[in-house]
Amino acid sequence: QKLMKCLSKQDETGVGDTKSVAPVNTIIQSIKGVSSSKEKDSSKVKSLTESVDTFLKSRYDFRYNVLTEETEYRLLERMEEGFAPVNQRVLNTFCLEAHESGISCWDRDLSRCIFSTRIAEYHPFKLYLEELPVWDGVDRLAALARRVSRDQLWVKEFHIWMRGMTAQWMGVTGSHANSVAPLLISTEQGYLKSTFCKSLLPPALQRYYMDKVDLTSQGHIERRLAEMGLLNLDEFDKYAPTKMPLLKNLMQMASLSLCKAYQKNYRSLPRIASFIGTSNRKDLLTDPTGSRRFICVLVEYPIDCEGIDYAQLYAQLKAEILAGEHYWFTKEEETELQQSNMTFYRQGPVEDVLRDRKSVV
């Protein structure tokens, strides 16, 4: 503005005011200095960003987990150790290493790179299934089911359920959620029921298994359906009959509408997790109409949980789904489930009296 006033004054007189020339030149030089300073600052920021980016890429491999919403890293020199989440402690270590390499930066400079959209996204379950080998054609599902029981109906039902679990991981279920849950039952202790449930997930996906399922908060369990791969209703008999309507509703959900703590808006997320359960009691079911949601199986012997060929097991399931094999239970198969589950109903007071009278007669 001062420059414009001086120039305007010169225009009015028609003659340059020698007294005002010096201030005008000073203002021009000042403007040039500010502009030059901004260019230098911009150049420094760009140089620092490039230095930080080059430093990180020279030492680490990064990826963004869309399920946990975490950035993960691994050392390029020790890639066999796998990925781990980037937390504040790790970020501070990155910053110290950058300083030791001669880069003058703050942890916020590193954060801008690490927690940006420049880090490639990945879905743990889809990545695992994409990297599977081609199925060799050998059926491994029947043998896995027979580790629990030799009952032929169980072998067939378990196979369908495993397809449903894998289909949810693949994101191809559409309107057919995996709405059925196997219940492994034995009155004897030490049959490794819970261990078998956990062993169904390959090592690369073990962190997405949970056996502490809280049915007191619907919002909490819905988040787990979107984040985990398998939820074990361990000691199924501890859940009150009043919780069964909520559980059956959760089992039928194909998609979820969630709002996380740090977010303002709800968003639709696909369901990933399936249910499984264990119990040491046989009298589990209370609702005959809801029994089609469970595959009750009596465990006949301690379960062998070792030596599972995960790569070929899931390659088989993936191949069957892509070939069009159904991963949901038909009406006929649901009827078979209800008939098979008759021996696992919980007797009420009236049934107990009638049973006692029959035994006397």
Predicted feature residues:
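Short, functional C-terminal segments
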Residues: L3-C6, V15-S30, I160, G164, ...
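N-terminal nucleic-acid engagement/recognition segments and initiation subdomains in replication
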Residues: Q1-D139, Q152-K156
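Intrinsically disordered or highly flexible coil/loop and linker segments, enriched in small
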Residues: K9-T13, G171, A323-Y327
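Glycine-centered small-residue hotspots that permit tight backbone geometry or close packing
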Residues: L67-T71, L192, S279, G290
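Feature primarily recognizes SF3-like P-loop helicase cores of small DNA viruses
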Residues: L96-G102, R108-P124, A177-V180, R207-M210, ...
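P-loop NTPase catalytic core of nucleic-acid-dependent motor ATPases
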Residues: S116-A226
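Charged/polar, low-hydrophobicity segments characteristic of intrinsically disordered regions
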Residues: L7-S8, G14-A22, Y191-P203, Y310-L313, ...
